[in-house]
Amino acid sequence: EVKLLESGGGLVQPGGSLKLSCAASGFDFSGYWMSWVRQAPGKGLEWIGEINPDSSTINYTPFLKDKFIISRDNAKNTLFLQMSKVRSEDTALYFCARNWDVGFDYWGQVTTLTVSS
């Protein structure tokens, strides 16, 4: 059974940093592209970026690439999202997802980031 379990969310002050994790199990993690996606309150899903199996290619949505860093540890079957200089508009539900074809076939259970002073 494929499972993706996010962690690391919480309350962060504006300008702060946070690292989210996504622990994968039930499949060969090292063989798949993986993505991060978020959903702000009252908004639709927003793709953050993706990373290929050996971390040699990482793609970001343009306006987030300077503040978010995606990485992975295949030995630990874990995907990461390092966020810096967070602002109130970064408040959202954050999901990891396994890429498949032109979309995603499995999603994580979600972790929540709230940016507030």
Swiss-Prot record:
One Pfam family of this chain: V-set
Annotated keywords: Adaptive immunity, Immunity, Immunoglobulin
Transmembrane residue ranges: none
Highest taxon of source: Eukaryota
All residue ranges annotated as the Ig-like domain in the record: 1-116
GO cellular component entries: extracellular region; immunoglobulin complex
GO MF annotations in UniProt: antigen binding
Annotated GO biological process: immunoglobulin mediated immune response
PANTHER family given in the database record: IMMUNOGLOBULIN HEAVY CHAIN
Comment field (misc): This chain was isolated from an Ig gamma-2a myeloma protein binding 2,6-levan.
The protein's name in its UniProt record: Ig heavy chain V region UPC10
Organism annotation: Mus musculus
